Every structure is written in structure tokens, then in C-alpha cells.
Swiss-Prot record:
NCBIfam families documented for this protein: metK (TIGR01034)
Keywords in alphabetical order: ATP-binding, Cytoplasm, Magnesium, Metal-binding, Nucleotide-binding, One-carbon metabolism, Potassium, Transferase
Pathway membership, UniProt: Amino-acid biosynthesis; S-adenosyl-L-methionine biosynthesis; S-adenosyl-L-methionine from L-methionine: step 1/1
Cofactor comment: Binds 2 divalent ions per subunit.
List of residues binding ATP: H16, D167, A168, K169, R238, F239, D247, R253, K254, A270, K274
Organism phylogeny: Bacteria, Pseudomonadati, Pseudomonadota, Betaproteobacteria, Burkholderiales
Residues bound to L-methionine: E57, Q100, D247, K278
Major location category of this protein: cytoplasm
Gene label: metK
InterPro entries xref list: ADOMET_SYNTHASE_CS, S-AdoMet_synt_C, S-AdoMet_synt_central, S-AdoMet_synt_N, S-AdoMet_synthetase, S-AdoMet_synthetase_sfam
Family: Belongs to the AdoMet synthase family.
Protein name: S-adenosylmethionine synthase
Required co-factors: Mg(2+); K(+)
Amino acid sequence: MANDFLFTSESVSEGHPDKVADQISDAILDAIFKQDPRSRVAAETLTNTGLVVLAGEITTNAHVDYIQVARDTIKRIGYDNTEYGIDYKGCAVLVAYDKQSNDIAQGVDHASDDHLNIGAGDQGLMFGYACDETPELMPAPIYYAHRLMERQAQLRKDGRLPFLRPDAKSQVTMRYVNGKPHSIDTVVLSTQHSPDQSETPHKMKASFTEAIIEEIIKPVLPKEWLKETKYLINPTGRFVIGGPQGDCGLTGRKIIVDTYGGACPHGGGAFSGKDPSKVDRSAAYAARYVAKNIVAAGLARQCQIQVAYAIGVARPMNVTVYTEGTGVISDEKLSALVHEHFDLRPKGIIQMLDLLRPIYEKTAAYGHFGRDEPEFSWERTDRAALLRAAAGR
């Protein structure tokens, strides 16, 4: 990539229909884990106007009222009025869960290559990433896109901007100079709103636009980056119909929002609704943990980790480190350090990050990475000093 360029990432609010689905799936996972943390869970959710469908595969000894969990999640998000697209009190909730396939279970429970470990729940490749663009070691565009959505929800829920409704999207286009963030070129923010905020069917009231810029955008974004920044606020001119009424929502459709905003590759596997025996989720968390500790150790300015697995096999097919020329030691030496200091077998990951806990609903909006939440063990940098010493730095 050239040293001077524009790069864009987007986020969506907790009220976006796909994120509603993600949060329901992870709320169900958490409810199960509170009773039986050894459960196997693959909980998928569909949301539409007045309708929620719960399907997937669950093997558990827990007794969970899935319908109530779904309603409680929708209520927490703020869909408490049919005018918003779905109402937690009156929506229909259909439940269609099966048990995990015995063919899959035998490979997960008894790894073919390691009698002391569980096997990977599926084949696949996962990526982790970290860089020094923000204190949280995340790419700046996705980090600030998330913060805009958090701010929108905060002002909606505390009543400071009472005309806001749950569904929203943000997009941040960053200008890079000499490979580093220099300024924000464009901010797009579209938010669902009450009908009285439209001046015409194709134009928002000036007071609405001003409130979004002054109350949501400017308090979040660094002032030094707002140099001739362009603001596009509800550019269609109206966003009254939203949430599951505006679009059908499905679990797992916001995988780039969930990760790094396109700053690194994605293996394709979604996270929400999956217990940590599914390496789509747990190995992606572990790869972030590894990459973040390498950058925190000062061994690279940016670091990408790829891991890959075969179903029923515990040991990864590969663990590859790529620092795009920013490493202070070679990528091969960094890969050797990763093999030495991180156990990336599924059970090793679960133990290393303490993943058999009901911690997942919180991950399902505003990104799984780059957030200072006490439950997010993959965000710790507790191995940075160890890596630095092992590298002789």
C-alpha cells in the first residue's frame, strides 16, 4: 500500500438489525453458559418486522427460556415500540434448535492428534491484528467508527437527543500521510429518527444535522484530525423506517465491523452465538491477543497473525506472523516466539483466555476488539514483557 492514501471503515449501532441478531445469539450463549459452561452452542438468529427466529445447534444441560432471553435483549437495545420496527412485548419468537451433530462432536471431544486436548470444531483460517494507530492498538478508522455508534446510543438512551431511534450506521474515511493517520477526510453518520426531524421527504432539518455533528461526532473524534472534514448526515434525507422493519437481520453478517474494519484479511467465520470450541471465534480472539502483545512489546508497529485448523485436529495447520516490514526482528523469528509462548490448540486458547464464561453478549456490538472491558481477556498485554525479553530487546 502507498504511504499516502485514504482508508475507510464502518460500524453499525446495537439497533442495526444484524446486530440485534448477533446480540440475541450471544445473550442466549451467555444464558446457557451461566448454567452449563461445557455446552456446545451454535445459536443463529433472524429478525424481521415483528418476528424473531432462533435456530441452530445446542447441546446442553441448561434450562433456558430462549424466548424471554430474546425479548429481554430487544428491550435492552431500545425496541419498545412497534413504530421502531419491532417491539419486545409483542413480537413473535420462534424456536427451532437441534443438538450438535454426533459426527462433529466426536472430532471436537477427542482430537485425532492429541489425546490431552479437544479438536477444532471446524476447518478454517482466522486472523488477528494490532497496530500502533490508537492507544488500544487498533486501526483508527474502525476504532472511531465504533465510538461514534456508542455515542449515538448513549445520547439516545439518556434522553439528550430524544429524537434518535436505535438503528444507525457510521463510516470514517481517514487520510494517511507517510503511512500514519493524518486527518479525517469524511464522516458519514446515518441514524434512525422520529418523523418530525425531516424538513421534507428528502431533507433533514438543519437542527438535526447540527445536533449530530456537535453532540455525537465532534466530542468523539480527535480535534487535530478534523481538518476540512466533510460530514454526511443522513444523506438520503430521511431514516424513519429502520431496524428489523427496514431490513431483515441475521447473525454473522457484520464480520468486518466485528473485527478490524477491513484493515486486515478475514477468514470468513462469524463470532456471535458460538461457544469457544468453535475456532472461528476463539482462535480469532487468540490471534488478536498474540498480535496485540507483539505490538505492545515494541516488536512491530503493526502485526497480522494467521492461524488455520482442520476439524477434529487440535494443533493449528499454521501460525504465520506478518508485520509488513515494521518488525524489529524478522517475521520468522516472531513466528518462533509465538510457537514458544502461546498454546493455540483449542483447549489451550480456552484456558489461556478463560473463555468458558458468560461474557459474550457485550462483544456483540461496537466491536470484539480494541475495547477496555474487564471481561475481554484477549485485550490484555500481559505477555508483552515476556516477548520483549525473549526477543532480546
